[in-house]
């Protein structure tokens, strides 16, 4: 396989501008993000995620994030049928780490904002101010129908109205310890939360629709987006540009953090063979479920996250951007990611998390010009 990314050279000023943060998307669900019978098969456990978070911290990753998933896709691999809960997992990880930032995901249809505010303040205390919250509106209807809390399909078109009220309650409670917010979805009557977080609580989101980006531009500290394609590291640039345009309306600085899967080995050819092997084992039954669910939302337009996830181009890993190559090739492609205006960081998954993080820290990160500021630290831990 030929290197998809040309070698880049940067001046010192460029290196400073292109300094990029790295996060790990910990596998809270079984089998991580590969919907394949040929991929590693494993259950989510605290011990596994503890080892991943500690290894990521060892190699100076900046943050760890867990999603929330309440119902999986089934199939031969029982994909995401087995999941831990995000806040309790991240509270545990906060207690066994010391530097890395920790983010949990709130499925906002399942948790009142006042409860999330208090849980977040608690994990802020556990972590010493290293905690933040990822807010999701919910796209997979069966997750909520199974509990009898799906608000009806009109929710698809009103979900960011709901989330806007939700985050206003959170900001009230974290900022002042009190909320009397009155809206269409929430009514607070002298609602109290104390103690408040020790530092301002970070709120993140993953909006790719126009409504999602408008929300992030107004309320989020940064916004996640999907990478696109295989070995096309800058293909997400139009999405990052849309996010920058959205912030022009609010006057806020909200950077994009891009989701990629890293599959790396000694050579490009060896890694390409591994990627083709994963694709050959695609769990078609689970993928059919994903496609079916992506078609339930007929009201939000064509630019939502779930529409990209179900695209058949690379559905075996939910169509996140995929970087497949030698350690040097992956390092060059990640430097290309850093060159995109508005891209402040990446959120990484791996085909094998423990070995993947180790080889990233030992073999890839030292070659990345956008991580050159860590050279002294990586020499210490190598």
UniProtKB/Swiss-Prot annotation:
Enzyme class: oxidoreductase
Keyword Kinase among UniProt keywords: no
Residues where FMN binds: 68-69, 134, 143, 159-160, 209
Keyword match Flavoprotein: yes
MF terms (GO), sorted A to Z: alkanesulfonate monooxygenase activity; uracil oxygenase activity
Catalyzed chemical reaction(s): uracil + FMNH2 + NADH + O2 = (Z)-3-ureidoacrylate + FMN + NAD(+) + H2O + H(+); thymine + FMNH2 + NADH + O2 = (Z)-2-methylureidoacrylate + FMN + NAD(+) + H2O + H(+)
Induction: Up-regulated by the nitrogen regulatory protein C (NtrC also called GlnG) and repressed by RutR.
The enzyme's E.C. designation: 1.14.99.46
UniProt-listed GO biological process terms: alkanesulfonate catabolic process; nitrogen utilization; uracil catabolic process
Disulfides per UniProt: none
Gene3D superfamilies with a match to the protein in the record: Luciferase-like domain
UniProt keyword list: Flavoprotein, FMN, Monooxygenase, NADP, Oxidoreductase
Alphabetized Pfam families for the sequence: Bac_luciferase
Role summary: The FMN-N(5)-oxide reacts spontaneously with NADH to produce FMN. Requires the flavin reductase RutF to regenerate FMN in vivo.
Family per record: Belongs to the NtaA/SnaA/DszA monooxygenase family. RutA subfamily.
Protein name: Pyrimidine monooxygenase RutA
Organism of this sequence: Shigella flexneri
Highest classification ranks of the organism: Bacteria, Pseudomonadati, Pseudomonadota, Gammaproteobacteria, Enterobacterales
Gene: rutA
């Amino acid at each position: 396989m030929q290197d998809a990314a040309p070698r880049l050279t940067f001046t010192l000023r460029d290196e400073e501008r292109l300094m990029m943060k790295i996060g790990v998307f910990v596998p809270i669900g079984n089998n991580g993000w590969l919907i394949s019978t040929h991929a590693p098969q494993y259950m989510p456990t605290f011990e596994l995620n503890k080892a991943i978070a500690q290894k990521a911290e060892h190699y100076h990753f900046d943050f760890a994030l867990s999603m929330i998933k309440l119902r999986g896709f089934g199939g031969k691999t029982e994909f995401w049928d087995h999941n831990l809960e995000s806040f309790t997992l991240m509270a545990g990880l906060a207690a066994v780490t010391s530097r890395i930032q920790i983010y949990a995901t709130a499925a906002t249809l399942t948790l009142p904002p006042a409860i999330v505010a208090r849980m977040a303040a608690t994990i802020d205390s556990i972590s010493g101010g290293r905690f933040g919250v990822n807010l999701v509106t919910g796209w997979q209807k069966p997750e909520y129908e199974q509990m009898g809390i799906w608000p009806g399909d009109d929710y698809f078109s009103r979900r960011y109205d709901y989330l806007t009220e939700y985050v206003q309650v959170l900001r009230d409670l974290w900022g002042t310890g009190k909320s009397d917010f009155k809206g269409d979805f929430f009514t607070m009557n002298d609602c109290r939360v104390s103690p408040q977080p020790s530092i301002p609580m970070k709120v993140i989101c993953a909006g790719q629709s126009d409504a999602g980006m408008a929300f992030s531009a107004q309320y989020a500290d940064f916004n996640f987006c999907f990478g696109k394609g295989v070995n096309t590291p800058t293909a997400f640039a139009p999405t990052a540009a849309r996010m920058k345009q959205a912030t022009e309306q609010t006057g806020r600085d909200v950077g994009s953090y891009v989701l990629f899967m890293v599959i790396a080995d000694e050579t490009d050819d060896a890694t390409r063979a591994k990627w083709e092997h994963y694709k050959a084992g695609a769990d078609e039954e689970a993928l059919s479920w994903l496609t079916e669910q992506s078609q339930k939302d007929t009201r939000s337009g064509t630019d939502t996250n779930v529409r990209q996830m179900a695209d058949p181009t690379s559905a075996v890993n939910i169509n996140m951007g995929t970087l497949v190559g030698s350690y040097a090739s992956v390092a060059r492609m990640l430097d290309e990611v850093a060159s995109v205006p508005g891209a402040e960081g990446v959120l990484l998954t791996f085909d094998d998390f423990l070995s993947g993080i180790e080889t990233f820290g030992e073999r890839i990160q030292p070659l990345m010009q956008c991580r050159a500021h860590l050279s002294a630290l990586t020499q210490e831990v190598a």
